[in-house]
Amino acid sequence: VTDSDRLVVWLRETLDAAQADAEAATSGPWHVTEYVAGSDYGFDAGVGTAPGEVDVVGHGYEGGGCERVQDARHIVRHNPANVLRRIAADRKLLDLHRDDLGKCAECGQGYELMDWGPDFPCATVRLLAEGWGWTEGEQA
């Protein structure tokens, strides 16, 4: 197994795991419910599937709650639908930038001889993997 193969296998497995998590999560859209400062909840915000609901990240006494509104907004921005859309786009990029005899099929377009094109994995594939947590240590 080459380093290129290892990176692509790792990336596809990572995308599969993220997709499974997103598909199993509470579907959205998600909304932030901000609590009045000093409320009995002990938290600044909750996250729910409708405005005013907190069925994703509940009140403090329900074992949930976000201590900061910014955390709740971040959670909402990464709801399952958004994650699935990004995964689908990343898979399309990975399919375009595929290995073609050791060169990137997409980046190598325009080269008469493929042996002059960029090596695979190209910068696009390496950056995709980096965005999902790949480090040089993963290659060991």
Model segments located where?
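Residues in flexible loops and secondary-structure boundaries
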Residues: 38-40, 64, 91, 101-102, ...
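Aromatic-glycine hotspot motif
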Residues: 2-51, 91
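Amphipathic alpha-helical oligomerization segments
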Residues: 17-32, 78-113
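Short intrinsically disordered terminal tails
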Residues: 1-10, 27, 99-140
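A short, structured beta-strand/loop element
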Residues: 41-82, 88, 106
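Exposed alpha-helical structural elements
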Residues: 6, 10, 14-17, 70-74, ...
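Compositionally biased, intrinsically disordered low-complexity segments enriched
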Residues: 33-37, 61, 99
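Generic preference for well-ordered secondary structure
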Residues: 2, 14, 59-62, 67, ...
